[in-house]
């Protein structure tokens, strides 16, 4: 007989194990057995909760996006000006619990997954639309080149994540400063044209 209340805990353990396993191996070439072992359960139980490795990967992707969305909402709630709100979006992208090595490696792997799996592609599109929308909302109040700046900032954020996943020692404060400085430069240039 199954233990009451264990499913959410076991699902959470599996999601965390997916992120840890991908983060450690830096690859999607992990097995359900590896994930389950890391979570302290059998492969059969992992399959019971998710059905497939792909669904475990999607759940991990959703988890990372959910953490990120929660951080963005908190940052926006505390901001009072358009520039403060933009800074909040940038800060959320590079918060230490979001921009940690295992999650940046997992995130890079999810980009690869999104090329071939419709569910992952959909989640990636939702993330990209939300990021662009959050940037545009306040950029439109600050610059006539809001669309171009939003696209460039989104690409820069993705690029910083890509570089962080490919090398050791990436720091969230340095990444945040890099994107924030770029934003200031873009705003200054766009308002002097």
Language-model region placement:
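N-terminal intrinsically disordered/low-complexity leader segments
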Residues: 1-9, 191-193
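Amphipathic alpha-helical linker/stalk segments
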Residues: 2-3, 16, 24, 60-88
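Solvent-exposed, amphipathic alpha-helical segments
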Residues: 13, 17-24, 71, 75-78, ...
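Helix-turn-helix
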Residues: 13, 17-55, 59
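Hydrophobic alpha-helical connector segments
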Residues: 59, 73-103, 150-153, 176
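Amphipathic alpha-helical segments used for helix-helix packing
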Residues: 98-122
